[in-house]
Every structure is written in structure tokens, then in C-alpha cells.
Design a protein with these regions (language model features):
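Helix-rich cap/lid subdomain of alpha/beta-hydrolase
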Residues: 1-53
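Short, hydrophobic alpha-helical segments
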Residues: 110-114
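Conserved serine/cysteine hydrolase catalytic core
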Residues: 28, 35-104, 108
Length: 114
């Protein structure tokens, strides 16, 4: 990841894309993903999120856990869904990008929730 604090953004380095986000994706899918990646603003990462039980607390929460994720390792994912409990945790044996590597399986999980 390339940080540019003066300009207010971060950029993913191309050499880190496959091992971090797409290690179980085809080269064709990785090329497609690259076309859609852009700069990420830094400012939102440092602004606290404020929610209320009345609004955010009333929304059903389900977590899709990616067991082969190298960007958000499973231990960190577990910490996230433990600190903000979810009704259900669905585990997938994929990288950070199940929408690229296992779209059918992901769609089936999402459809099962409706």
C-alpha cells in the first residue's frame, strides 16, 4: 500500500494485489479487478463512526467470513464480528474477494438470507 498523506489518499501497489486480495482468483479476474481499483481517501479512515441502537442497532447483521483472507486475517475478522455481534456468521474458504473467486457460492449465501 502506498500512502500519500499530503494528497489525502492511499493507493494499492500492483505487486501486492494478488497475494493480499486475489490469491484464489484467475489472472483474468485480477486484470478485471485492477481496472476498477482507484485511490482510497484517507480522511474517512480517521473519522469515528457514530451510530445509534435505534437506527444501526435495528439492522440485521450477517458477517461473511473469508477464511483465506490475507487483507483482514480471520483472527481480525473474528474480533470484528465478536465486538459487533451478528445474527449469523457465514464462513467461506476464499480470499478477501469471494465476489471474484466464488461468486456463485457467495450469491447462494446472500439469497439464503432473504
Amino acid at each position: 500500500m502506498e500512502m500519500h498523506p499530503e494528497e489525502g489518499y492511499t493507493l494499492l501497489k500492483e505487486e501486492g494485489l494478488k497475494p493480499t486480495f486475489y490469491h484464489d482468483c484467475s489472472e483474468e479476474d485480477i486484470d478485471l479487478a485492477k481496472v476498477h481499483l482507484g485511490l482510497q481517501a484517507l480522511k474517512p479512515m480517521g473519522v469515528p463512526v457514530r451510530t445509534t441502537n435505534e437506527n444501526f442497532g435495528s439492522v440485521r447483521r450477517v458477517y461473511i467470513e473469508c477464511l483465506q483472507d490475507h487483507a483482514l486475517v480471520p483472527e481480525f475478522q473474528k474480533q470484528m464480528y465478536t465486538e459487533l455481534p451478528c445474527e449469523q456468521v457465514i464462513s467461506m474458504d476464499t480470499s478477501h474477494s469471494p465476489f471474484m473467486s466464488a461468486p456463485g457460492e457467495l450469491a447462494n449465501h446472500l439469497m439464503s438470507l432473504s
